[in-house]
Amino acid sequence: MAQVGSAGPGACGRRGAGAGAGPERTTWRWAPALLWLATAAAVAGDPSRRQWPVPYKRFSFRPEPDPYCQAKYTFCPTGSPIPVMKDDDVIEVFRLQAPVWEFKYGDLLGHLKIMHDAIGFRSTLTEKNYTMEWYELFQLGNCTFPHLRPEMNAPFWCNQGAACFFEGIDDSHWKENGTLVLVATISGGMFNRMAKWVKQDNETGIYYETWTVQASPERGAERWFESYDCSKFVLRTYEKLAELGADFKKIETNYTRIFLYSGEPTYLGNETSVFGPTGNKTLALAIKKFYYPFKPHLSTKEFLLSLLQIFDAVVIHREFYLFYNFEYWFLPMKYPFIKITYEEIPLPNRKNRTLSGL
């Protein structure tokens, strides 16, 4: 299935999978910029809304993407429907992890521990393998920064993420520079119940969120916003399998996160309240000015100048405008501003102690 339900690369960027149709409006160069900003940073509202972290908003259905949004790499080109397994089948569950953009940069980002996560399955009855992953429809840049279209007053976002399921596991891709390891064994019936959950999760969780935002790097620091990316999909799926009765092996599992550090965020409003006819024109201009350096299709000279502008805004003036749940927030940035981590998050414990899920 091209997508689990209806409907490229970030910390969850998958390997390239073919050229997308239409103009390449999404050729972004900001993966190196994020790394540069993280290095440079290391060197150098309404009270009723303030539930921290802000809950990720879910939707009743997945909207069709706007035709303006075109992917450089086709989303889920070999996708297929999730098969119905026989209840007495034994399904092996594999942890899959490989460097982001391995198809383009090899193990370069692997050395920096910037990894993409997925899940593999193997049916012992049919001996067929399957891969399931969740990633951006229009690549990382569009999920993280908007387009500033001259015919529109508000920033325009091409931000959707979705699940992709297809037959086969590319052993060399996952093993050569990453991880392919058995983490659990489940029944076919348990797999089928998981599949129903995946479809519902995919239809209601429609957009990608790059950043995890919290008050400081300290353990237990206040967290303002959670990311919503490939690793979070894998973690949610593991939790669901544990809920259904899966027993996971005791092995170390680490995941990439991109953190922003800020004081308590200030809620600014949604697109209408900020950019509409009665919106705050000064605030609207400030938000667009902040996003301007992140635009795509820059020459080398423009790209370097944009890096300086980003550094000035985020590190010198300590400002960041975050778009989350289709609403805008102001982040008063704090040292170390931005950081890419590779953290251990343990596999879940079995939650259902009966044999009903087996």
UniProtKB/Swiss-Prot annotation:
Region described as Membrane-anchoring: spans on this chain: 303-342
Please note every region of biased composition (Gly residues).
7-21
Pull the Cytoplasmic topological domain ranges from the record: 1-29
Q: What keywords does the record list, in alphabetical order?
A: Disulfide bond, Glycoprotein, Hydrolase, Lysosome, Membrane, Neurodegeneration, Neuronal ceroid lipofuscinosis, Signal-anchor, Transferase, Transmembrane, Transmembrane helix
The record describes its quaternary structure and partners as:
Multimer. Interacts with SORT1, RAB5A and RAB7A. Interacts with PPT1, TPP1, CLN3, CLN6, CLN8, ATP5F1A and ATP5F1B.
Homology family: Belongs to the CLN5 family.
Name of protein: Bis(monoacylglycero)phosphate synthase CLN5
